A protein has these predicted regions:
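Basic, amphipathic "hinge/linker" alpha-helix immediately C-terminal to the N-terminal HTH DNA-binding motif
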Residues: 3, 56-80
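Solvent-exposed, amphipathic alpha-helical segments
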Residues: 13, 49-51, 79
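A general structural signal marking secondary-structure boundaries and capping sites
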Residues: 18, 48, 84-88
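C-terminal regulatory/oligomerization modules of transcriptional regulators
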Residues: 68, 75-120
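N-terminal helix-turn-helix DNA-binding core of bacterial DNA-binding proteins
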Residues: 1-33
Length: 120
């Protein structure tokens, strides 16, 4: 499941960019195809990494959230972002600086942010 490029990018977009709807995932700059996105979201839900709920403002739309299992991937994704920043030009240098300045504080903020979203 996690060896798939698209699954990790979806989790990254949820964790670091705040993407929560199908449309927000499609708007990512990687250009994921709709059939691949739908398949990976289904698999992430089936593996207990992501959960869904109906959007209160539009019951036809789903809101995706990371589960505790998904949030536990924060250290893995942080290391991947830092590795990419060390070896390639990355788009969000401010985020990389935050990670490098105090990785544990950054991770605590990510975890707390998702816990807050889950309690809404």
């Amino acid at each position: 499941m996690l060896g798939d490029r698209w699954s990790l990018l979806i989790i990254r977009d949820m964790m670091l960019r705040g993407a929560r709807t199908y449309k927000e995932f499609l708007e990512g700059y990687e250009g994921i195809a709709t059939n691949i996105l739908a398949d990976r979201l289904r698999k992430l839900v089936a593996h207990g990494i992501v959960t869904t709920e109906a959007d209160p403002s539009d019951g036809r739309r789903l809101i995706y959230s990371l589960t505790a299992k998904g949030i536990d991937l924060a250290p893995v994704l942080t290391e991947m972002v830092l590795w990419a920043a060390a070896h390639e030009e990355t788009g969000n240098q401010a985020l990389v600086r935050l990670m490098r300045a105090d990785k544990e504080k950054f991770l605590a903020g990510v975890r707390e942010g998702w816990r807050d979203r889950q309690s809404l």
